[in-house]
């Protein structure tokens, strides 16, 4: 198992990196979009990795932090959801928001991600909700109302989700959550 790789990024092509280690070995690593954007060609990096061996071949997946890797591994445990789909999910939403969506059984939010059908979202929630149970927003009605309010005010959905997740505290009313989220967004 290759748990991590440290080295210099020789080439970036989309979300595929060529990383040369100090010993001269060059690894081809498939990353999520955010990780690929964080590293620079010619720069040094450390990636948490997972080696996938399947009938299609051997693929090395890389992540900028351990949390993303753990989430990726959890997603690959879901029946009929392979590493490519798991990587696509992680590339389209930040790890904390995904954990919150799964823990709070937000099938609607998950099914809005590219390539994720309602059935797949339901399967993800059903198979992983217990694993992430303590991490979610408890009252999804307040979450969705606040999110919709921010979107209707013109904020992009991803920014609105991040703001709501960041300021949420258990027991908040919708109006309080919207107010705090707007404060958070105005400081950015």
From Swiss-Prot:
Fetch the CDD domains from UniProt: UBA_RuvA_C
Subunit comment for this entry?
Homotetramer. Forms an RuvA(8)-RuvB(12)-Holliday junction (HJ) complex. HJ DNA is sandwiched between 2 RuvA tetramers; dsDNA enters through RuvA and exits via RuvB. An RuvB hexamer assembles on each DNA strand where it exits the tetramer. Each RuvB hexamer is contacted by two RuvA subunits (via domain III) on 2 adjacent RuvB subunits; this complex drives branch migration. In the full resolvosome a probable DNA-RuvA(4)-RuvB(12)-RuvC(2) complex forms which resolves the HJ.
Q: What Gene Ontology molecular function terms does this protein carry? A: ATP binding; four-way junction DNA binding; four-way junction helicase activity
GO biological process per UniProt: DNA recombination; DNA repair
Region: Flexible linker; residue ranges are 143
Spell out the protein name for this chain. Holliday junction branch migration complex subunit RuvA
- The segments labelled Domain II in the record are 65-143
UniProt free text on domains: Has three domains with a flexible linker between the domains II and III and assumes an 'L' shape. Domain III is highly mobile and contacts RuvB.
Q: Which InterPro entries match?
A: DNA_helicase_Holl-junc_RuvA_I, Hlx-hairpin-Hlx_DNA-bd_motif, NA-bd_OB-fold, RuvA, RuvA_2-like, RuvA_C, RuvA_C_sf
Region Domain III, as annotated, extends over 143-188
Under the heading Pfam families, the entry gives: HHH_5, RuvA_C, RuvA_N
Gene, per the UniProt record: ruvA
SMART domains associated with the record:
HhH1
Q: Which SUPFAM superfamilies match?
A: DNA helicase RuvA subunit, C-terminal domain (SSF46929), Nucleic acid-binding proteins (SSF50249), RuvA domain 2-like (SSF47781)
Q: Which organism is it from?
A: Thermotoga petrophila (strain ATCC BAA-488 / DSM 13995 / JCM 10881 / RKU-1)
Family named by the database record:
Belongs to the RuvA family.
Cellular location of this protein? Cytoplasm
